[in-house]
Regions:
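Conserved donor-binding/catalytic core segment of Leloir-type glycosyltransferases
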Residues: 22-23, 186-213, 225
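Donor nucleotide-sugar binding/catalytic pocket of nucleotide-sugar-dependent glycosyltransferases
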Residues: 135-182, 189, 249-252
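A charged, aromatic-enriched C-terminal amphipathic alpha-helix characteristic of glycosyltransferases
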Residues: 36, 184, 322-323, 336-370
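A conserved mid-protein helix/loop that constitutes part of the nucleotide-sugar donor-binding site
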Residues: 32, 36, 200-215, 231-234
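Nucleotide-activated donor-binding/catalytic signature segment of Leloir-type glycosyltransferases, i.e.
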Residues: 234-261
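Membrane-proximal helix-turn-helix segments that form the acceptor-binding/catalytic region
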Residues: 65-72, 96-100, 107, 128-148
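Nucleotide-sugar-dependent
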Residues: 115, 204, 258-263, 272-292, ...
Length: 376
């Protein structure tokens, strides 16, 4: 059996028959993270993966009861319970059910409760009881796991430092979706076309990008398209208008994922993340993978999480100094147009090899969880 990189993929050595996995807490079966994890288990490991149906009943209590029943029923036939990325608060329940059924618990910590509510969205104060509750839930998710998944080495190291878990913490790279393929450059043009897409969350640091555009001034003609919606969009629009950048910036409402490719194809540069939080300094955002896989220059802030990506992407990846608008401005002034960029023709394959190596490690750790129950 071989992965996308062409190297042999190791199957778990956990007993006879295919591995049986219950994927619990999936909020959206089309979300790229759980789609890729599920595909790896099914296509490369020959696992049987069942997604526990999510209740849509009226009333929170009714939904909770339905979800617990779904978890218990599914776990009876599972060797592994895989808790999906947006349900870390369910980790103690998933742990209890998995233990009662003799299954291992794998937790995908890709989206932490605290970092999302406190760092990303800033919905609650770090000193609030709600923030403390989120910290406790995140810690419980790590402690409950037999195997804990995250997306980058820096974030994995931080989890180990903070929680000291007995279970392995395995970075599982995000990677680019199948639709993100190399795009021919747009016909020659004069202005540098820059693309931002996302939800205007603090992680993205859009305010810093606006500051950078102000600093560029007359140094270069730059046109920016901003695709997406979010609570902060109106504030960004106001800031752009007050800075006199209205002729440089075009705001576009959110589009389906399938339409992003056309926006990327038209761009010379795709923007990554520029936020000031610890998470912003430790992630490789979806848009970074996607922009690079499409053969576009990606400008994003410097992070050790980008080390492997940097070697695969070559000159397409441009890193800026954290929290520095002037560094972003310099990067945009010096960025090549798409038809001038030195883009490795196999950049998507190189990036996929980086992802596959992380999934190979996941396979090894999954294999080490121990013998499974015999199939009935």
């Amino acid at each position: 059996m071989s992965g996308p990189s062409g190297r042999p993929t190791r199957a778990p050595r956990l007993g006879a028959g295919p591995l049986r996995v219950l994927q619990y807490g999936v909020h959206d079966t089309g979300y790229p993270r759980n789609v890729r994890v599920r595909a790896h288990l099914e296509r490369q490991l020959g696992a049987s993966v069942v997604v526990a149906p999510r209740s849509h009943a009226a009333g929170r209590l009714r939904r909770a009861i339905d979800d617990v029943r779904s978890l218990v029923r599914g776990a009876r036939q599972a060797d592994v319970v895989l808790l999906s990325e947006f349900r870390l608060s369910h980790a103690p329940l998933a742990w209890l059910v998995a233990r009662l059924q003799g299954a291992a618990l794998v937790v995908d910590g890709f989206v932490g409760q605290y970092e999302t509510a406190v760092d990303d969205w800033r919905r609650v104060s770090p000193a609030s009881p709600a923030a403390l509750r989120f910290r406790v839930l995140d810690a419980a998710a790590v402690r409950c796991a037999d195997l804990y998944l995250i997306d980058t080495e820096p974030r994995a190291a931080e989890i180990v430092r903070r929680h000291g878990p007995s279970a392995a913490v395995v970075p599982l790279a995000v990677g680019a979706p199948a639709w993100a393929t190399r795009q021919p450059p747009a016909p020659p043009h004069d202005a540098l076309r820059v693309l931002y897409y996302g939800g205007y969350i603090p992680l993205h640091g859009v305010d810093l990008v606006v500051d950078a555009l102000t600093l560029i001034g007359a140094r270069r003609r730059v046109e920016v398209v901003l695709v997406g919606d979010g609570p902060a969009r109106r504030a960004v629009e106001t800031r752009v208008r007050r800075a006199g950048l209205g002729d440089r910036c075009t705001f576009v409402d959110a589009v389906p994922e399938g339409e992003l490719l056309a926006h990327i194809a038209r761009a010379d540069v795709v923007l990554g993340v520029f936020g000031s939080s610890a998470k912003a300094r430790g992630v490789v955002a979806n848009k970074v993978w996607q922009g690079l896989a499409c053969g576009r220059t990606v400008v994003t802030q410097r992070s050790s999480a980008l080390d492997d990506v940097r070697y695969a992407a070559g000159g397409l990846l441009v890193q800026t100094e954290p929290t520095s608008a002037s560094s972003i401005a310099d990067a945009l002034v010096g960025a090549p147009l798409a038809h001038q960029a030195e883009s490795p023709r196999d950049v998507a394959e190189r990036l996929e090899s980086v992802v596959q190596r992380s999934y190979d490690r996941f396979t090894d750790h999954l294999s080490a969880l121990g013998p499974r129950r015999e199939h009935p």
